Amino acid sequence: MKCPECVSENQIKYISEFYQNMENALYSKDGYTTDSKGERHALSDYIDIESLARMYLLQEFSMNLDSGITSFYLYKDSDLTGDGKLHAAPVWDFDVALGNYTSRNGTDFTDPTQWWAKISRMYDNSSKYNVMAQAVQHEEVWNKVKELWQSEFMPAIKYILGESTAYTATKIKTLDAY
């Protein structure tokens, strides 16, 4: 836990149990877990699926070696004033992304047809999937990834490349603008 700096033991216990329940659902085959009260909960009860899908797309598109392993942040909305879920954000640390690293565990980062975030393991090829790779093993997350790829990422990419004028962004410029 990065912040806040000063927290009570009860708060640490609460967030630890919450995160553990999220991981239990994440690493389960069906995306569900049973909490300490005996109640069954879905992965989507613990983490915002859309923010997770957006983070996945950004990590995969950039072929970020750190995807879901290090420099991967989540924040939790308040149970009282927010949705009470974890959210994947902010994006951070792309020093070994976008071609700054050539290979790891047999994955060639210079090959644009390779998956990385989808198959990334914690330490080596024999360890379990990291958070990002495990998330997209669940149909709910993978379907959201596909939806966002078609509805937002591809239109933005086509706009940047000058292949489409249909994208209406104020902060994104085409390559011709540079």
Regions found by a protein language model. Name each.
Residues M1-S62:
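ATP-dependent phospho-/nucleotidyl transfer catalytic cores
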Residues K2-I12, S16-Y19, E23, S36, ...:
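C-terminal catalytic region of ATP-dependent kinase domains
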Residues S28-Y32, S62-S67, V141, M154-Y159:
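Intrinsically disordered or highly flexible coil/loop and linker segments, enriched in small
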Residues D45-Y101:
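Active-site acidic catalytic loop and adjacent metal/ATP-binding pocket
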